[in-house]
Curated annotation (Swiss-Prot):
Keyword set includes Phosphoprotein: no
Keywords associated with the record: Disulfide bond, Glycoprotein, Hydrolase, Immunity, Innate immunity, Metal-binding, Secreted, Signal, Zinc
Record EC number: 3.5.1.28
Gene3D superfamilies for the chain: Peptidoglycan recognition protein-like
Chain positions recorded as Zn(2+) binding sites: H47, H155, C163
Domain of life: Eukaryota
GO CC aspect terms: extracellular region
Cystine pairings recorded for this chain: C54-C60
Cofactor: Zn(2+)
InterPro entries: Amidase/PGRP_sf, Amidase_domain, Peptidoglycan_recognition, PGRP, PGRP_domain_met/bac
Lineage per the UniProt record: Eukaryota, Metazoa, Ecdysozoa, Arthropoda, Hexapoda
Name listed for the protein in its UniProt record: Peptidoglycan-recognition protein SB2
Marked site (Important for catalytic activity) residue numbers: Y81
Gene designation per UniProt: PGRP-SB2
All residue ranges annotated as the N-acetylmuramoyl-L-alanine amidase domain in the record: 40-165
């Protein structure tokens, strides 16, 4: 009974926007030499990972490790995104707040990168993913990591790419802080 109650409480906490820490999926801490972000930033750039989707913590942790390994092979300093959203509706810490990402070259020093795990050229992310991203943005504003007057753009608005997928981009256009230009 106590275990069930603990699991329910944990689920409620995650549902309220707890960020799953990087240490749950990556044993390597972020290097103290990683460039810092000047916060609050005014720009949130949305991506999709074009990987397999994930629907539970175990699957998502595997995908996160694969993404980080791919980014490291491509000579990134670490995983490129600040946060990732799993198909399980959880918010996974990548670089986290205050660290400059490597997700949109001309905009890394002035933005937070949020990646939806999966490919959204072929369909819309599940509603729990969309809600998790909105929750993360609220947390970022509350923690003064993102300006209250922030803008949301898709990666394709910063360079020639299909990212974050046409279906996710069309959804972003409905969000109140979406802008046609960064």
């Amino acid at each position: 009974m106590k275990l069930q109650l603990a699991l329910v409480l944990c689920g409620l906490t995650l549902a309220l926007g707890q960020i799953v820490p990087r240490s749950s999926w990556c044993p390597v801490p972020i290097s103290p030499r990683m460039p810092r972000l000047m916060v609050p930033v005014r720009l949130i750039i949305i991506h999709h990972t074009v990987t397999a989707p994930c629907f539970n913590p175990h699957q998502c942790q595997l995908v996160l490790r694969q993404i980080r390994a791919d980014h490291m092979r491509r000579k990134f300093r670490d995983i490129g995104y600040n946060f990732l959203i799993g198909g399980d509706g959880r918010i996974y810490e990548g670089l986290g707040f205050g660290i400059r990402g490597e997700h949109a070259p001309r905009y890394n020093s002035q933005s937070i990168g949020i990646a939806f795990i999966g490919n959204f050229q072929t369909g819309l992310p599940p509603s729990q993913m969309l809600q998790a991203a909105r929750t993360l943005i609220q947390i970022a504003v509350q923690r003064r990591q993102v300006s209250p007057n922030y803008s949301v753009v898709g990666h394709c608005q910063t360079k020639a790419t299909a990212c974050p997928g046409i279906h996710l981009l069309n959804e972003l256009k409905k969000w109140p802080n979406w802008r046609p230009k960064p």
